[in-house]
Amino acid sequence: IRILTPAVEAMKAQGMDVYGPCPPDTVFMQCNEDMYDIVVAMYHDQGHIPLKLLGFYDGVNITAGLPFLRTSADHGTAFNIAWTGKANPESMAISIDMAMKITRE
């Protein structure tokens, strides 16, 4: 709270439409109900659990704080179905599309 609240206030001062910090046990459902456009999670597991529940096949993981853009499909490698013809590439395609959209903005 001592770091997040001043960061949110600084973004508001720059004209950004932001809200928070929010309790993680409710914010993802609120986002799913279109109260927010995006949720920034402070921890990997805190963000992945609801993202996988709400959008396993179309969720995109965006890693912040790197010197390069990193997006990935929001599921594992599924070695158990590798080379069986069962894998669905759609979430990887969505991840690539998101990376291209971000680089254009």
Curated annotation (Swiss-Prot):
Q: Which cofactor(s) are needed, names only?
A: Zn(2+); Mg(2+); Co(2+)
One matching Pfam family? PdxA
Identify the GO cellular component terms for this protein: cytoplasm
Question: What's the EC number here?
Answer: 1.1.1.262
Per UniProt, a divalent metal cation binds at H44
Cofactor info, note text: Binds 1 divalent metal cation per subunit. Can use ions such as Zn(2+), Mg(2+) or Co(2+).
One MF term from GO for this chain? 4-hydroxythreonine-4-phosphate dehydrogenase activity
List the keywords (alphabetical).
Answer: Cobalt, Cytoplasm, Magnesium, Metal-binding, NAD, NADP, Oxidoreductase, Pyridoxine biosynthesis, Zinc
Metal-binding among the record's keywords? yes
- Single GO biological process annotation from the record: pyridoxine biosynthetic process
Task: Tell me the pathway.
Answer: Cofactor biosynthesis; pyridoxine 5'-phosphate biosynthesis; pyridoxine 5'-phosphate from D-erythrose 4-phosphate: step 4/5
What is the protein's known function? Catalyzes the NAD(P)-dependent oxidation of 4-(phosphooxy)-L-threonine (HTP) into 2-amino-3-oxo-4-(phosphooxy)butyric acid which spontaneously decarboxylates to form 3-amino-2-oxopropyl phosphate (AHAP).
Similarity section = Belongs to the PdxA family.
Put simply, this protein is called: 4-hydroxythreonine-4-phosphate dehydrogenase
Q: Which organism is it from?
A: Enterobacter agglomerans (Erwinia herbicola)
